[in-house]
C-alpha cells in the first residue's frame, strides 16, 4: 500500500528514526530525538538544531591550557566565558587548525613541524589571536611572535616557549614553571610561592617584578635570568650565562 503524508508549511513536528527513513531529504541522525522540525518552501528545516558555527563555539570551550604554533600576536584575557578569535588574511587563516583536545586549546600551524622560525626576512604574515578564558594552567608556544596575558590566578602554571617568542604577563600562582629555549624571552610580574625556571639557548627571563618565595633557576647556552626571591634561591649558571637576583635570598649554588 502506498501512502502520501502531507505536512502543512511551518507546522512544527518531531520524528524518530523510523519516520526519517520515509523522508527523501537527508536527516542527520544526531538531530532526531528532542529536536523540532518544520516544512518550508525550501524543504525540511530543523528549528532548534545547532548551526556549524554554534557547534564550533561549543567545541572551543572548557579549556585551561593553550598550545600554539605559527607566527602570531596572541592576547589572553581573563573572562568568565570562552572565545577564540583569529584576525588575519584568509589565506593565512587556512594554514591554521583550531581545535580542543581534552582541556587543551590547540592552534596549530599546518606547515612542516621543523620550520625554522629564526630565519631573517620570514614572509609569513602575523596572525592576531585573542583568547578569553576563566583560568589558565599551561601555555605552550612554538614559533615567532608575542604573547600577552594579565590578571590570572592559578594554583599551578607552566609556560613553555620554543623559538623567538616574547611573552609578557602578570600572574599569581602557587607553583610557576618556566621553560624558555631558542631565543625566547619572558617578562613576568605578580607573585608565586615556588618558581622553577629553565632558560637555555640565548633566551632571557625578566622577572624582577615577580615576587617569588623560593626559586630554582637554571640558565645555559648564553642565556640570562633576573629574579626576585625572598626565601631560598637555587642557582645553576652555565657557561656564558648569568643569573641576577634581588630580595636577599639564601643562595644555594649548583656546579
State what each model feature region is:
Residues 1-13, 19-160, 170-179, 187-196, ...:
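Acidic (Asp/Glu) and glycine-rich low-complexity loops/linkers
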Residues 233-255:
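Leucine-rich solenoid repeat scaffolds
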Residues 206-210:
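Outer-membrane beta-barrel transmembrane domain signature
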Amino acid at each position: 500500500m502506498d501512502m502520501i503524508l502531507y505536512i502543512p508549511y511551518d507546522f512544527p513536528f518531531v520524528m524518530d528514526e523510523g519516520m526519517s527513513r520515509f523522508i527523501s531529504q537527508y536527516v542527520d541522525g544526531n538531530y532526531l530525538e528532542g529536536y523540532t522540525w518544520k516544512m518550508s518552501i525550501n524543504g525540511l528545516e530543523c528549528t532548534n538544531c545547532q548551526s556549524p558555527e554554534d557547534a564550533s563555539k561549543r567545541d572551543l570551550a572548557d579549556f585551561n591550557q593553550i598550545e600554539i604554533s605559527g607566527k602570531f600576536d596572541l592576547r589572553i584575557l581573563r573572562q568568565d566565558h570562552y572565545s577564540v578569535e583569529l584576525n588575519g588574511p584568509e589565506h593565512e587563516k587556512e594554514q591554521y587548525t583550531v581545535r580542543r583536545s581534552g582541556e587543551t586549546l590547540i592552534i596549530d600551524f599546518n606547515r612542516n613541524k621543523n620550520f625554522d622560525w629564526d630565519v631573517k626576512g620570514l614572509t609569513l604574515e602575523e596572525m592576531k589571536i585573542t583568547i578569553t578564558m576563566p583560568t589558565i594552567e599551561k601555555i605552550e608556544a612554538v614559533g615567532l611572535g608575542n604573547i600577552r596575558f594579565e590578571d590570572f590566578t592559578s594554583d599551578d602554571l607552566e609556560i613553555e616557549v620554543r623559538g623567538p617568542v616574547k611573552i609578557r604577563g602578570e600572574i599569581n600562582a602557587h607553583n610557576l614553571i618556566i621553560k624558555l629555549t631558542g631565543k625566547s624571552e619572558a617578562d613576568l610580574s605578580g607573585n608565586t610561592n615556588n618558581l622553577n625556571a629553565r632558560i637555555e639557548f640565548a633566551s632571557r627571563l625578566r622577572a624582577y617584578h615577580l615576587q617569588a618565595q623560593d626559586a630554582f633557576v637554571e640558565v645555559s647556552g648564553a642565556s640570562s635570568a633576573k629574579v626576585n626571591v625572598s626565601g631560598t634561591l637555587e642557582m645553576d649558571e652555565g657557561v656564558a650565562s648569568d643569573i641576577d637576583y634581588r630580595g636577599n635570598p639564601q643562595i644555594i649554588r649548583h656546579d
